[in-house]
Amino acid sequence: MKKFFASILCLGMIFGATGCTSGGDDTYEIAMITDSGSVTDKSFNQSAYEGVKEFGEKNDITYKYYAPKDTDQAGLLSTIDDAVDNGAKVVVTPGFNFSGALYQAQEKYPDVKFVTIDFEPQKDGSGETKVGDNTVSYLFSEQESGYVAGYAAVKEGYTKLGFMGGMALPAV
C-alpha cells in the first residue's frame, strides 16, 4: 500500500512539473474528491487524502478535498467542475463511482490532469472505457489476491470454499 501511495505522490510531482513555466508564480491546487465516504473513513478515501495532503505539504502545493452533495454521475461531475473552477490542476478520484463523470471530465478539461484509483473512465456504464492523455488510472489486481487466498485455503486442506462480496462488481 505504501508503494501505491508513493506512486501517487511521484505522479503528482510529474503533473506539477508539467504545468510549470519559467518565471511564473503560479500555484497549483490538487483536488481530491471523495466518492461516498469521508476523508476520515479509515479506508480508501482517507488513504488517498492523506497521500494528497502529505504531497501538498512537502511540496508547498495547495490542496483541498471535496465531498460531493450527490453521488450520482451528474453530482460527481458537478463536484469536479467546482474543483476545476477553484483552480485545481490535478484531480484525484478514488473509487469506481467516478467512472462516468471522469469519462466526461477528461474531455471537458484537457488542461487538467486526472488520477483515477481502481477504475478506468467509462462511458455511461456501456463498458466502453477511455483513458485520455490527461488521465492516469491505477488499477488493483483483485483477482490475484483472491486466487492466492483460495489456493492457500486448498493447500491447508479445505475443499469446500465460499465467498461473499459486498457489491455486484466485476472485481467482486
Per-region residue spans from a language model:
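Short, low-complexity disordered leader/linker segments with a strong preference
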Residues: 1-29
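Extracytoplasmic "Venus flytrap"
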Residues: 30-58, 64-77, 95-98, 168-172
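An alpha-beta-alpha
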Residues: 52, 145-172
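Short, well-structured alpha-helical segments in soluble
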Residues: 73-88
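Periplasmic-binding protein-like
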Residues: 87-95, 113-117
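Hydrophobic alpha-helical
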Residues: 93-109
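Short, charged beta->alpha transition segments
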Residues: 102, 122-127, 144-152
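Flexible loop/hinge segments that line or gate small-molecule binding clefts
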Residues: 107-139
